[in-house]
Amino acid sequence: MTIAKTYITADELLLDSFRLGVQIHNSGFKPDFIVGVWRGGTPVGIAIQEILAYLGNESDHIAIRTSSYYGINEQTKEVRVHGIDYLISNMNAEDKLLIVDDVFDSGRSIRAILDTLKEKSRKNIPHDIRMAMPWYKPLRNIIDTVPDYFIHETDDWLVFPHEMDGLTEKEIFANKKNLKEILSHVK
């Protein structure tokens, strides 16, 4: 069975990110902190932070990263969270936190971020934590949480503007305009 692929352009991702920002603004939520999850969540987080600032909501913002690896003789993956110390040192229970990524897939990374924040922040964990992603895959979600803000639902394999891994040369040249010419300069 062939999995359908949805190719997302940089402009589409940017506009969807601004749309998310307007959704967040219209909901009345005013985050004190915005966290973009490296890699895909960072450009989305930047656009959301920019449009919220334009609309009068200044916020602190930072990127964090998650990684997965297989432990020795283990069948399950553990998700680790990196770069969260700034949040732990600066957030309070009264703050509002927005976690931003490009897609909500299984939810494992979000669960790891929330669990790490709870463990390390203890009483300082913000009481209002929300999530925003342009894309949501409800059938892949394995946790008891859904994003508060999203634009699209899909089961397709999403190919974001920066992604090349897992694509054939034919797919890259057909779906990533101008990349053939750029790659022709590789020595």
Task: Go through each PLM region and give its residues.
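PRPP-associated nucleotide enzymes
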Residues: M1-K187
